[in-house]
């Protein structure tokens, strides 16, 4: 969901590795789709982190926990506009006016991957592997149940009508 750019490859590799250990939603190296891009520039005595909407300067040295906390605070306010809603992937939140709809981890993973792949869709098998990477058995009906539950949950919490098509093992969002 986020692409990291850095002026120091060693620093970037370490940051990506540590964020990955925290189960932070980074973009897949084989997939160029992401919601946001973060630029990290190391200077003499500080680390400059920026997104399209925010900029942060951190004094060096700093602990990874401090970096992660500040980075997460900054990136969690990034949003994607979806119809008349704001989707905050890092908060697992969909918002319209003052109405907040909180998503479970699986619901958020489904929503983010449907949005990231809104142009061409995503293969069901790929989505299953993202959600349940350790499952040896693949059950398409398990994914279908979660898709239906997400659609029903959004509809019950608001007037959000999640529409998608499923053809030949490919799921794609449908926008009005």
Model-derived features with residue positions:
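Short amphipathic alpha-helical recognition elements used for nucleic-acid or partner binding
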Residues: 99-131, 150
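Short acidic low-complexity segments
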Residues: 24-46
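Short, positively charged loop/turn segments that connect secondary-structure elements
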Residues: 133-142
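DNA-binding patch around the recognition helix
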Residues: 76-89, 95-96, 101-103, 145-176
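Basic, amphipathic DNA-recognition helix from helix-turn-helix-like DNA-binding domains
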Residues: 39, 43-83
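Short, charged N-terminal beta->alpha structural module
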Residues: 1-31
